[in-house]
C-alpha cells in the first residue's frame, strides 16, 4: 500500500514540475513581446529613431 502511495506522489510531482516549466516558457515569450512594445513606444518619441523605424511608428 505504501508503494502505491509513493508512486502516486512521485507521478504527481513529475507532472506538476513539467507543467510549471512549460508555463515559464510562455511567460518568457510574453515578457519579450512586452519589452519589444516598450522599445517601439520609446523609439517613436525620438525623432531620429522614428525616422529609422517608420514601420513601428506608423
UniProtKB/Swiss-Prot annotation:
It is found in: Secreted. Residues 1-16 form the signal peptide. Changing residue 40 to A: Little loss in inhibition. Residues 17-38 form a propeptide. Allosteric inhibitor of alpha-1B adrenergic receptors (ADRA1B). Binds to an allosteric modulatory site on transmembrane helix 6 and 7 at the base of extracellular loop 3 of ADRA1B. Also weakly inhibits alpha-1A (ADRA1A) and alpha-1D (ADRA1D) adrenergic receptors in a competitive manner. Potently inhibits contractions of vas deferens, spleen and aorta in response to noradrenaline. May also inhibits nicotinic acetylcholine receptors with a possible distinct nAChR binding mode from other alpha-conotoxins, due to a different three residue motif (lacks the Ser-Xaa-Pro motif). Negative results: has no effect on alpha-2 adrenergic receptors (ADRA2). This is Rho-conotoxin TIA. It comes from Conus tulipa (Fish-hunting cone snail).
Amino acid at each position: 500500500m505504501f508503494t502505491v502511495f509513493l508512486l502516486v506522489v512521485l507521478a504527481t510531482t513529475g507532472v506538476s514540475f513539467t507543467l510549471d516549466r512549460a508555463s515559464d516558457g510562455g511567460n518568457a515569450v510574453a515578457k519579450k513581446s512586452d519589452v519589444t512594445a516598450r522599445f517601439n513606444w520609446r523609439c517613436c518619441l525620438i525623432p531620429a529613431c522614428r525616422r529609422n523605424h517608420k514601420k513601428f511608428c506608423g
